[in-house]
Regions:
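Gly/Ala-rich beta-loop-alpha elbow adjacent to hydrolase catalytic centers
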Residues: 40-45, 49
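Catalytic histidine-centered segment of alpha/beta-hydrolase-like enzymes
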Residues: 234-248
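Short beta-strand immediately N-terminal to the catalytic nucleophile in serine-hydrolase-like folds
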Residues: 39-41, 66, 202
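Catalytic histidine neighborhood in serine/cysteine hydrolases
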Residues: 215, 220-237
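Conserved alpha/beta-hydrolase "acid-adjacent" motif
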Residues: 208-214
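Alpha/beta-hydrolase-fold enzymes
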Residues: 30, 34, 49-163
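Short beta-strand/loop motif that positions the catalytic acidic residue
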Residues: 195, 201-203, 207
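Alpha/beta-hydrolase active-site loop
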Residues: 10-31
Length: 285
């Protein structure tokens, strides 16, 4: 849904879940001629997808969550500890639209040495070579370009609509209502037990933003009999873009999804009815 502007400051989580996401799902269902579709959400988008699947289970065939927080009562990540003491009202009332740069600053401070010093020292070490080695220089040029592309993507964090940020921080981070089935959107309770479709919960073992403790409880919170967890030895960003992890993450999701995407004549996939936790052997790039 792009980058929010001043006119979007009053959009709520309900607007995103029951508005934008629901409209997108309905559009795909109509164009594909299906009753249900597979929904995959990443990080905060995964949390919104969980809410959507709980409120509209009749439209979701399979639910895939990727590094998605649902349990915010954890001390494994600084983000969760800090959030409990933040004056959310003061932040939202001051900014209206919460700047993405402000959020990025907070993310960097969760692991400042690694994220602000170590990785930049590392890139210089990676591109060191003999000045007369033309092949090495060409490889380094592409290495630097890829590094800068990644930096641009990482720091391209859209601002957040104020009221959405207010509710997400208060109801999720501070009150932990979602996992307790006490969160409400437009007066309707989000009950995770309504999620009965096949679930794939994908995590990064070394995630500093969404520790596994924040994601694992989803499996017990839903009523799905067909649910699986995949854990990859990467960080929060590495699970998307690490060269080695990409050889495992996407194929792993595809292997899980393929047998569950077969139609049984009603728009439903044929679940395999298993519960399993597997850890990938991929290395972090």
């Amino acid at each position: 849904w792009g980058y929010p502007t001043g006119m979007d400051r009053y959009l709520t989580i309900d607007d995103y879940v029951n508005g934008y996401v629901n409209n997108a799902v309905d559009n795909i269902r109509e164009k594909a001629g299906l009753d249900k579709i597979t929904l995959l959400g990443v990080c905060q988008g995964g949390t919104l997808s969980v809410m959507y699947a709980a409120l509209h289970p009749e439209k979701v065939k399979n639910l895939i969550t990727l590094v998605t927080p649902v349990n915010f009562d954890t001390n494994k990540g600084l983000l969760y500890i800090w959030a409990r003491g933040l004056d959310i009202d003061r932040i939202v009332d001051y900014y209206g639209i919460v700047p993405g740069d402000l959020l990025n600053s907070g993310f960097l401070l969760t692991d400042p040495f690694r994220l602000m010093i170590d990785k930049y020292v590392g890139i210089f070490e990676r591109i060191e070579c003999n000045p007369n080695d033309t092949a090495c220089s060409l490889r380094n040029e592409e290495t630097v370009k890829n590094f800068l592309r990644m930096e641009k993507w990482i720091f391209d964090s859209p601002d957040q609509a104020g009221e959405t940020f207010r509710q997400f921080m208060k109801d999720c981070y501070q009150k932990n209502l979602l996992i307790k089935n006490k969160m409400e959107l437009n007066g309707k309770k989000v009950n995770l037990k309504k999620i009965s479709m096949p679930l794939l919960n994908v995590m990064a073992e070394f995630d500093h933003l969404v520790p596994n403790d924040a994601s694992v409880p989803l499996n017990d919170a839903v009523s799905s009999s067909d649910k699986e967890t995949l854990i990859f030895p990467t960080g929060h960003i590495g699970i998307f873009v690490g060269s080695k992890s990409q050889k495992e993450v996407c194929p792993g999701i595809a292997r899980w999804l393929k047998p569950r995407s077969l139609l049984d004549g009603t728009g439903n996939g044929k679940g395999k009815g298993k519960r399993e936790v597997r850890k990938s052997q991929a290395s972090e790039a």
